[in-house]
Amino acid sequence: MSRITKEEIEKTKCGRFLLSDENIYLSIYSLNSYVFEYNLLNTEDRILYHRLQDKFDARLINGVITRVREQIIELFDKDKYIEAKVYFKPKKLSENGELEFRPLHSTGLITQIAIVSMLHLFVYEIPEEEEGDPKLRLSNLSRLIPSDFYGNRVSVKPEYLFKPWKQQYQKYNQNSNDALMKYHTSLEYKYEVTLDLENFFPTINPIIIYRYIINHLPAYLNDEERKMMKRVLQKLLFCKLTTTFDEKTAGQYYKVTKGAGNYDNVDKIEQNEKECWAFKEKSDKFVRGIPQGLPQSYFLGNIYMISIAEIFRKKFTGVSYFYVDDSVIFTNDVREDNFKEQLKELNKQIADEANNFEDDSAIYPEGTEKFYKSDLYGVNVHLDGKSNYTRLDNLDDSEVYLKCISREMSQAGSDFFRMYSDEENRNLEEKLDVLSKQVKAKRDQLVEEKSQKRDSGNEDAIEKDEDDTQKFEKRLTRYYRFFEYRKQRLVAMHQPENGSDEDYNMQLY
């Protein structure tokens, strides 16, 4: 692929739309909805981000449109790719006590606007050029996203690239909680299955998404239009990595997970990682998998999940809910004595599905074929711990309540680290206050019921329920502390707004 000029790009309808002022302005207008990692922007880009909140500063907007257009044209050069840095965000402690990290990618603000301008070709229908004031319409690809996918759904409101994640995550939690309570009562489905994909974004082979999208482009596109779409898609999928690793960070980034359960020992896994690292030292570094943190990754992740979700639904028929790579399924198809084998069968079906996609080395950036065909790639379901099932007929009302609250904890924890404004801060503070009071009321109710049982003198009933009640009470206390601590930290963040230290201390304590 040699570099082409602006005039050559604009020979196609999709090329004219790509470079148009209207398309690039739309990317600027929806800026707040896709800059997911604001704190990773440099100072200059943060200033530009805030200046771009004024969507009617014509001089600034026109200057940004020109810079974005130039960057898009530059990316059509054969050897030019989106350049990204990777940062490691603490994720959890492993079973052996080591801290694990999630790799998050970031790039300049102009580049992110260029990415979204390119992504528009795939998420929206390209409007007819004679349309005076075209409305946003979802593309064929966007309409393929199943209705039970809640995360990162494309919006047709110009101020949002994706539907607001908070509302969508809340819907996911609320609907799955409602289903839990419904099927716990009716037992139409006897099991709740939760499936977790291991190291999801880094283990997606971009070639699979490339083939899926190309196979689902509109049939009416002529050869030149399809060629243009392929070129843009390749630039969205393959990103250069500008971060320099030491051995420790390289081990985190290039950690092998594909088929890890099939290795005889840890030494083989470590040797595989060293081979991948040695290869990376000798070549231009490219982002592993899909670059989580950049705007295109979440739409591309949903596209990949379409076939994964279909495999899940066939294995566990019933009612399902998906949020990116998290899933909850209510089903009757669990083999209790052989659940792990069912998970292994899922992994085999996922691998078989991946092998069905035609490979083409010409699609890979030059010199990267070995990297993209290595054992770094291959999405797997966790075989232990995170993927599990729960028998609904074995749950009492208190356990159903705890499962629902645990989902609220997950959402609140995510909200806490993704606030960018005082308004979001206060909204979350109010939500945490409500949750804290609800849990405290439930805990107080439990203590009162326990006291009444003791007063009744029914020793058999007391002894029978004591252990379960104590466990329930401890978990409620832990949840209460979780919500209350985060609420108090939010109060502390805006102490100056609260007036005197006395007022502040009253709120805090």
Language-model segments: what does each one mean?
Residues 89-92, 109, 197-200, 323-334, ...:
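An acidic- and aromatic-residue-enriched active-site/binding cleft used to recognize and process polar
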